[in-house]
Regions:
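Acidic-histidine catalytic/liganding microenvironments
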Residues: 25, 62-63, 127
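Glycine-centered tight turns that cap/initiate beta-strands
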Residues: 27, 64, 141-144
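Short, Asp-centered acidic motifs that coordinate Mg2+ and/or phosphate
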Residues: 32, 66-67, 147
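Beta-loop-alpha module in the N-terminal Rossmann-like domain of NAD(P)-dependent dehydrogenases
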Residues: 50-110
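Predominantly a Rossmann-like dinucleotide-binding segment in NAD(P)-dependent oxidoreductases
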Residues: 124-183
Length: 183
């Protein structure tokens, strides 16, 4: 039996990661998408034959829908995650989880109350350069660090949607990998 999933937000992380992962996973069935941009949702509907909704609440009532990925800008995460949890869905939310610890705690309380799973997509925990760093540490090649910092970056121009969505300039500079070890 396949897990019936939906994707909320049809931007780059959804179209580049979540949607292809669900489409190609034999254990999942992507059944619904929602984006505040109707055109983005319709494009996914045309490309994959998945029902695109114009209203989030309606999408969350899709028959058989069990779990959703939240792939929207972080300032929307709390409200969307809470609505999805209250509708009985398990949630995989993109990072960062929330704007502050108060919002994160609210989300966790609702997950606990509804007995739904809330998982945050901190995918860098399994990122190959981080595993290599762990290997080097185990072999005592680089010594004992007192702090570790990793940045993800791209080599292209600034991302035009950042200003429009309110995402900080910091995020535009932290995509790609550079690791720093401090002793």
């Amino acid at each position: 039996m396949k897990l019936k999933v939906g994707v909320i937000g049809c931007g780059g992380i959804a179209t580049g990661r979540h949607i292809p992962a669900y489409i190609n996973n034999p254990n999942t069935d992507l059944v619904a998408v929602y984006d505040s941009s109707v055109e983005k949702g319709e494009k996914i509907e045309e490309e994959y034959g998945v029902k695109a909704y114009k209203n989030l609440s309606e999408m969350l009532m899709h028959p058989g829908l069990e779990a959703v990925s939240v792939c929207t800008p972080e300032m929307t995460h709390r409200d969307i995650v809470i609505e999805a949890l209250k509708s009985g869905k398990h949630v995989l939310c993109e990072k960062p989880m929330a704007l502050d610890s108060k919002q994160a705690e609210e989300m966790l309380k609702v997950a606990k109350k509804t007995k739904r799973i809330l998982m945050i997509s901190y995918n860098q925990r399994i990122y190959e350069p981080h595993w290599k760093a762990k290997e080097l540490l185990k072999q005592d090649i680089i010594g004992k660090p007192i702090a570790f910092r990793s940045f993800l970056s791209h080599g292209g121009p600034e991302i035009p949607y950042m200003e429009r969505t309110g995402r900080s300039d910091f995020l535009t500079k932290t995509e790609g990998t550079v690791a720093f070890f401090y002793r």
